[in-house]
C-alpha cells in the first residue's frame, strides 16, 4: 500500500459497502480483486474486476499491488478471450461515477454491433441475464480462470 493510503473501507462507497456489484454476478476471488459479470450483457462477457480495498487511483497502490492487480486483470482478460472467442478486449478504468478502482473488461466479438466505437457510445437497451443463463456464463468463466492459473 502506498504511503498515506488507508486500508479502511469508505462508508460512502457502494463497492466498499458490498451493494455493488451484485453478489449473484460473482465470478472469482483473484487475490487483491474480485471478478463479477456486469449487469448489462449487451456486450456478452462484460466483466468487472473490482479492487477489494478502497483506493481511487492506481498511484494509491504500492508497486507490488499494481503489478498483482494487472496480473489479475490480465488473467480475467485471457479467460474472457477464450470463453467468448473475442477479437479484442477493451480495458476501461474510469472511476468518475464510482470512485473505487475497478476495471471494465469488455470482449469485442465478431458480431460486434459497433466494432470501432467505445461501448459507452453504443446506444442500446439494457440486457440483463438471470437464472440459468447468468449461472452458465459465470461457470464458464470460472472454469476458464481455473484452467489459466
Question: Predicted segment positions?
Answer:
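HIT superfamily nucleotide-processing domains
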Residues: 2-149
Amino acid at each position: 500500500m502506498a504511503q498515506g493510503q488507508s486500508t479502511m473501507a469508505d462508508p460512502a462507497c457502494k463497492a466498499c459497502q458490498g451493494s455493488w456489484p451484485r453478489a449473484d454476478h460473482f465470478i472469482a476471488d483473484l487475490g487483491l480483486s474480485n471478478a463479477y459479470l456486469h449487469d448489462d450483457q449487451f456486450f456478452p462477457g462484460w466483466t468487472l474486476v473490482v479492487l477489494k480495498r478502497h483506493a481511487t487511483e492506481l498511484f494509491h497502490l504500492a508497486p507490488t499491488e499494481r503489478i498483482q492487480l494487472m496480473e489479475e486483470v490480465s488473467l480475467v482478460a485471457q479467460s474472457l478471450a477464450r470463453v467468448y472467442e473475442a477479437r479484442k478486449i477493451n480495458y476501461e478504468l474510469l472511476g468518475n461515477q464510482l470512485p473505487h478502482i475497478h476495471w471494465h473488461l469488455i470482449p469485442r466479438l465478431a458480431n460486434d454491433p459497433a466494432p470501432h466505437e467505445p461501448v459507452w457510445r453504443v446506444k442500446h437497451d439494457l440486457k440483463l441475464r438471470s437464472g440459468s443463463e447468468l449461472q452458465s456464463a459465470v461457470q464458464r468463466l470460472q472454469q476458464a480462470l481455473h484452467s489459466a492459473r
